[in-house]
Amino acid sequence: MKQCVRGATMAIALNMAGGALAAPGKPVPYWASLSQDEARMRVGPSLDYPSNWVYRRRDLPVKVVQVLGLWRKIEDPDGAQGWMHVRLLSDTPTAIVKADAAPLRQAAGDGAMALFRAEKGVVGRLSGCASGWCNFDVKGQRGFVKADQLWGATDK
């Protein structure tokens, strides 16, 4: 019985610490994304510090620029910096369209047929980037986008 309780306590503790979220031990800077529908950026690495931003956009890409315990200093796509708890972050590779409009193409190449267009500010998931092109998924609409039209985990 003690063994079962001890195991459950350990599982809960690992889950609360964020498990494999936000790449502990990874050299900075590195890419992460928001794992929650709402996430607060704070002016310092503690719940005692006030929030300077509240994000309401799951999968928004962020760049982790500093690590302090369970806190990550992040930079958002607009350049704002602040601190977030590791539980609010994920290693899911995402990006945001920074061009006015980015065609999602059937294949990686300028001559490939454009399937969709993603407007500036659209967030999607990445499933790989190579030779200047990224496989970009926006809520099930998939295509290849030029990496220089995106901000996020395009260097993986």
Predicted regions and their residues:
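Short boundary/loop segments of OB/S1/cold-shock single-stranded nucleic-acid-binding domains
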Residues: 48-52
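Bacterial N-terminal signal peptides that target proteins for export
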Residues: 1-9
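Sequence-pattern detector for short linear motifs
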Residues: 9, 43-45
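SH3-family beta-barrel domains
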Residues: 21-43, 54-58, 65-142, 147-156
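Repetitive helical segments and hydrophobic/amphipathic motifs
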Residues: 11-15, 102
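N-terminal signal peptide c-region/cleavage motif recognized by signal peptidases
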Residues: 17-19
